[in-house]
Amino acid sequence: MRYGEKEIQEFDPKKDLEIWPNKHNKPYKIKITLPEFSCLCPRSGYPDYATMHLEYIPDQYVVELKALKLYINSFRNRYISHEDSTNEIFDTLYSKLKPKYMRLVADFNPRGNVHTLIEIDSEEIEKVSNG
């Protein structure tokens, strides 16, 4: 097993998803594109590919980019649906970073004539929750 495979296989987001202190007091937005997301369809086992678009306004923390890359890559051999993977990534990052705002868009490549786009927005969640 090569070192990269080992890092991905052993990645544990609870301990390995590194966050850093945000040194800036002014509000600013971070936009990250992760074009190589992959996971396995829980029904067929076929691979699913997506581009993840993450944007957030940090409060006290920012995510370390190599750790984020390894976290995203850790899905590549998991049997998980589009909805579950997107929600898990959003929930994990949101709970670790506690940002002022976060939005995750998962743009899955078409497969079987179906194109899936999943968006999770912390402001929308708050609006719906507060009714």
UniProtKB/Swiss-Prot annotation:
Keywords assigned by UniProt, alphabetized: Cytoplasm, NADP, Oxidoreductase, Queuosine biosynthesis
Annotated Pfam families: QueF (PF14489)
EC number: 1.7.1.13
Paired cysteines (S-S): none
GO term, biological process aspect, one: queuosine biosynthetic process
GO molecular function, one term: preQ1 synthase activity
Binding site for substrate: 63-65, 82-83
Active site: 41 (thioimide intermediate), 48 (proton donor)
Broad class of where this protein is predominantly found: cytoplasm
Subcellular location: Cytoplasm
InterPro entries: GTP-CH-I_C/QueF (IPR043133), NADPH_dep_7-cyano-7-deazaG_red (IPR050084), QueF (IPR029500), QueF_type1 (IPR016856)
Catalytic activity: 7-aminomethyl-7-carbaguanine + 2 NADP(+) = 7-cyano-7-deazaguanine + 2 NADPH + 3 H(+)
Pathway: tRNA modification; tRNA-queuosine biosynthesis
GO CC, any one term: cytoplasm
Entry similarity comment: Belongs to the GTP cyclohydrolase I family. QueF type 1 subfamily.
Function: Catalyzes the NADPH-dependent reduction of 7-cyano-7-deazaguanine (preQ0) to 7-aminomethyl-7-deazaguanine (preQ1).
Name by which UniProt lists this protein: NADPH-dependent 7-cyano-7-deazaguanine reductase
